[in-house]
Structures are given as structure tokens and as C-alpha cells.
């Protein structure tokens, strides 16, 4: 995006205005607010910033090329997304914070050493790092709102076993809209300025419920037990999710930490990816959060978006079958070339936006580096060796703009190491995580009064002219 010097200075002034308003909203607080109160305090500043930006509606921020239209709108700046910004060179930043910043600053659970995804949700929504006490209270609220209506249990029982887990998850999430406060309030009549509040309530309800729904999909023979299982309100969102999956207890503490890290890392990755954009698109029609995120889940179910982790695992296991556990660098290099020469891609490498190594991949590798049992796993050793050799092979092959590993190159293999060996379910876990970012933006869409999304289309003859 090319901006004039004047526009840059003006943007700087807008940012200063927002920071000043945010500072003023905090100045008179004497007690730690809950999440809704914290959000309510920052909405006026954000609305003022939005108003000032809207006054510049006629300014040009870029150009549209034919490649943008026929290439999936890749690289086209065309939607507002507050929680995160994905830089091709630096990777993802959450309100300006890197993953390492978040790992250092965001509160941890009562056990484990990894940041909590509910703390990430707080940061994404408010731009503020919550205190440990604030996150503990939020975790408690999520546990207390996790119960499901009976019709959801009955619905999941009715699904044929042949139905894909993502189909089940999306249907169940959509069916939860019987609980929507936004839908009920809108039907009765609701001021546009107040749309955000029942949207917030629905979003928290969905965050609280989606781990249990996901666990029911994972454990279809135990719907009645898992559907009514009491959660530990003193524990965090990921801990209770692991309990629902049947992986509780001290013997699974490392898995709990992996789950915390995974859910936090996958929660938001800007707004242009399919699951985030689909949620925003459907939400722009004022569909409630349950219906909106159900649409996002259907996008996530597509093999080009959410299935990469299981494809990596399948490919790595096939690689191990071929070259064994006592492999050489040449064995790995030759297998990579065999994959490419057969017309296939190397799964877990490259990215639609990133042009440098994915910092989420590095975060997972750092996690593994502190676990001797992971480092000793022959399957993980292949992941590590691939990350050392594949970039040079892919660069020589010459058909990728980013030869580096992405987060999927490690996530499925780590799940597999900890006994979570049902690859079809990896995307369901992704779906639990990805709820964080799109729901945050949906709340802000309502708070800022964003309109329904309605781009203009063009046909091939029009482009040819």
C-alpha cells in the first residue's frame, strides 16, 4: 500500500489519539475489570479512531490488478481486521506483539509453562495484556458456561459414523444458535450501537461450549458422559479441553502444555484466510456468532486450508516407511525430490503470505527442544531434518516463493507423539482454536457498525478489456 507523507503523518496522529483515549479510559480504574468491562472501556476510543478513518474514505490505499481478481484476491488489502497483522517478512503480530512477546507476557495456567489461549483472546479483543487474576476469572467463566442443551447431545448421537468430524462440528455449532442472545435481542428490537454486547455474550458462550462439542465428536460412544462431565472451574480452557478428550491427569501435563500453545498459536492469523473471512462475511449479514463461525468451520474443512497437519503426518509416516529410522541426509533429500518430481507438493512448506520462516513453527520446535522424549522420537527427528534440508531443495526446485516450514510441518507430528493419533480430528482441534480471532473481529464488527460485505464482481470479457 502506497501512502503519501501527509497520509502517514495523519495516520500517526490517529494512533496517538487512540492511545490517549485508551489511557484516559484506564486512568480512573481502581479494580481489575472483567473482560466485558475492559472491552466497554476501549470501545469509545476505537469508535473515534474509526470515525476519523472514515473521513478519509476517498483516499487511495492501493491498486487492484487482474491477478488479484483471478488469483483469489491474494495480496489485496480489502478488509478490516483488528487483532493481528501478518507481515510477509516478520510473521504474525498480535496488537504489535510477536509470539515470543506473548509467550513472555501472557499469563500461564496453574500448571505448565505455556501462555493461555484465553489470555490471547483477551489481548486480541482489548489490545491489553490481562493480569493473572483476570485470566483466572475468565477461565472460570468459560468452564461455567460450557454446558450444552440436550438437543445438541441428541443431534450428535444421530450423526452417522461415516460423517466427517468437521461436518459434525459445524452442524453442532450452527445448532447452538438456539442459545443466541443476539438473535433474540435483534428480533425484539435492538439499537445498532448495542449490537456488540449480545454478540460478545454469544461469542463467550461459543468459546465455552466448542471444546465440549469437539470432544463429543471425538468420543461419539460417550456422548452422555462427556456431554454432562463437570469441568474444573479452577483450571484453564485447554486443561478442561484435554480432560474432555480423555487426556487429563498429571501424566498428560506435557500434552496440556502443547494444547495451550497450539490453541494460542492458531487462534488468529489475520482476516484473509478462508475460515476468518467466511466468519466475517456471514457475520456481516448480522447472522449470530454461532451461524457465522459454523460457516468459518466449513471453510476450515477444505483441504487447502485446514487439513495440512494431517497431510504432513501422513507424508512423514510414509517417508519413515521408505527410508527407515537410520536415515542419512541424502535419504531425506532424495525423498523430497521424489515427492516433487511426482508432481506433488511437500506438505507443511510454503505459505500464502509469509516469505520467511513461520514463527509459529519455531515456537513448536522450541517446545519440542525442551522435551527429551520428543527429541528422541524418530518421526519428530524427520520433521527436524526436513526443516534443515527441504528449504534448499525447494529453492533449487524453483516453484515456491517461500521454501520454509510452516506451523503444520510440526503440529500434527507433535499431537501424534502424545498419543493423539486420529489425524481426521486435527482439523477439529484447529477449529476450536480458530474461534478466537474471528469471534474477536465479529464483536468489533458490531461495535464499529461495519456494513454487510458486498464486493463487485467482473466477468472475463470485462477483464480482457
Swiss-Prot record:
This protein's GO CC annotations: mitochondrial matrix
Record has DNA-binding as a keyword: no
Annotated binding of oxaloacetate, by residue: 269, 351, 360, 434, 454
PROSITE patterns: CITRATE_SYNTHASE (PS00480)
EC number(s) on file: 2.3.3.5, 2.3.3.16
A molecular function (GO) term: 2-methylcitrate synthase activity
Coiled-coil intervals: none
Active site, per annotation: 305, 351, 408
Protein's UniProt keywords contain Mitochondrion: yes
Domain of life where this protein originates: Eukaryota
Cellular location(s): Mitochondrion matrix
Catalytic activity: propanoyl-CoA + oxaloacetate + H2O = (2S,3S)-2-methylcitrate + CoA + H(+); oxaloacetate + acetyl-CoA + H2O = citrate + CoA + H(+)
Pfam families: Citrate_synt
Keyword annotations of the record: Mitochondrion, Transferase, Transit peptide, Virulence
One GO term of the biological process aspect: carbohydrate metabolic process
Pathway: Organic acid metabolism; propanoate degradation
Enzyme class: transferase
Residues of the transit peptide: 1-29
Positions of CoA binding: 74, 192, 304, 346, 348-349, 400-401, 406
Assembly and binders: Homodimer.
Entries under NCBIfam families matching the protein: PRK09569.1
PANTHER family: CITRATE SYNTHASE, CITRATE SYNTHASE 3, MITOCHONDRIAL
Function: Component of the methylcitrate cycle that catalyzes the synthesis of (2S,3S)-2-methylcitrate from propionyl-CoA and oxaloacetate. Plays an important role in detoxification of propionyl-CoA, an inhibitor of both primary and secondary metabolism. Also has citrate synthase activity using as substrates acetyl-CoA and oxaloacetate. Plays a key role in the estabishment of invasive pulmonary aspergillosis.
Family note: Belongs to the citrate synthase family.
Name the record gives this protein: 2-methylcitrate synthase, mitochondrial
Amino acid at each position: 500500500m502506497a501512502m503519501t507523507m501527509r497520509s502517514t503523518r495523519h495516520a500517526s496522529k490517529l494512533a496517538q489519539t487512540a492511545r490517549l483515549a485508551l489511557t484516559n479510559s484506564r486512568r480512573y480504574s481502581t479494580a481489575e475489570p472483567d473482560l466485558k468491562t475492559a472491552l466497554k472501556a476501549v470501545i469509545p476510543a476505537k469508535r473515534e479512531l474509526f470515525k476519523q478513518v472514515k473521513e478519509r474514505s476517498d483516499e487511495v490505499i492501493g491498486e487492484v490488478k487482474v491477478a488479484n481478481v483471478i488469483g483469489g484476491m491474494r495480496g489485496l488489502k480489502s478488509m478490516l481486521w483488528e487483532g493481528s497483522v501478518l507481515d510477509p517478512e516478520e510473521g504474525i503480530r498480535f496488537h504489535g506483539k510477536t509470539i515470543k512477546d506473548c509467550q513472555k507476557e501472557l499469563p500461564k495456567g496453574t500448571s505448565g509453562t505455556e501462555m493461555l489461549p484465553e489470555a490471547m483472546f483477551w489481548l486480541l479483543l482489548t489490545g491489553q495484556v490481562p493480569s493473572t487474576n483476570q485470566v483466572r476469572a475468565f477461565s472460570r467463566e468459560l468452564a461455567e458456561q460450557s454446558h450444552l442443551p440436550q438437543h445438541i447431545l441428541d443431534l450428535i448421537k444421530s450423526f452417522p459414523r461415516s460423517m466427517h468430524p468437521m461436518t459434525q462440528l459445524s452442524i453442532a455449532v450452527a445448532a447452538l444458535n438456539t442459545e443466541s442472545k443476539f438473535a433474540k435481542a435483534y428480533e425484539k428490537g435492538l439499537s445498532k450501537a448495542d449490537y456488540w454486547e449480545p454478540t460478545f455474550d454469544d461469542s463467550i458462550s461459543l468459546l465455552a461450549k466448542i471444546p465440549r462439542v469437539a470432544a463429543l465428536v471425538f468420543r461419539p460412544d460417550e456422548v452422555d458422559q462427556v456431554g454432562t462431565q463437570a469441568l474444573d472451574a479452577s483450571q484453564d480452557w485447554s486443561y478442561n479441553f484435554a480432560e474432555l478428550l480423555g487426556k487429563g491427569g498429571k501424566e498428560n501435563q506435557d500434552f496440556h502444555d502443547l494444547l495451550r500453545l497450539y490453541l494460542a498459536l492458531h487462534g488468529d492469523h489475520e482476516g484473509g484466510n478462508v475460515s476468518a473471512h467466511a466468519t466475517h462475511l456471514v457475520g456481516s449479514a448480522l447472522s449470530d456468532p454461532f451461524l457465522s463461525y459454523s460457516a468459518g468451520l466449513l471453510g476450515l474443512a477444505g483441504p487447502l486450508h485446514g487439513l495440512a497437519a494431517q497431510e504432513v503426518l501422513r507424508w512423514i509416516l510414509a517417508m519413515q516407511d521408505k527410508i527407515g529410522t537410520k536415515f542419512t541426509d541424502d535419504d531425506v533429500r532424495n525423498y523430497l525430490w521424489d515427492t516433487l518430481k511426482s508432481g506433488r507438493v511437500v506438505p507443511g512448506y510454503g505459505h500464502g503470505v509469509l516469505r520467511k520462516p513461520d514463527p509459529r513453527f519455531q515456537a513448536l520446535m522450541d517446545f519440542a527442544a525442551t522435551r527429551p522424549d520428543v527429541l528422541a522420537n524418530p518421526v519428530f527427528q524427520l520433521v527436524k531434518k526436513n526443516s534443515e534440508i527441504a528449504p534448499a531443495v525447494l529453492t533449487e526446485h524453483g516453484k515456491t516463493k517461500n521454501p520454509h516450514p510452516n506451523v503444520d510441518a510440526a503440529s500434527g507430528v507433535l499431537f501424534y507423539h502424545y498419543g493423539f493419533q486420529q489425524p481426521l480430528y486435527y482439523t477439529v482441534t484447529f477449529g476450536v482454536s480458530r474461534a478466537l480471532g474471528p469471534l474477536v473481529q465479529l464483536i468489533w464488527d458490531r461495535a464499529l457498525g461495519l456494513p454487510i460485505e458486498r464486493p463487485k464482481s467482473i466477468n472475463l470479457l470485462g477483464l480482457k478489456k
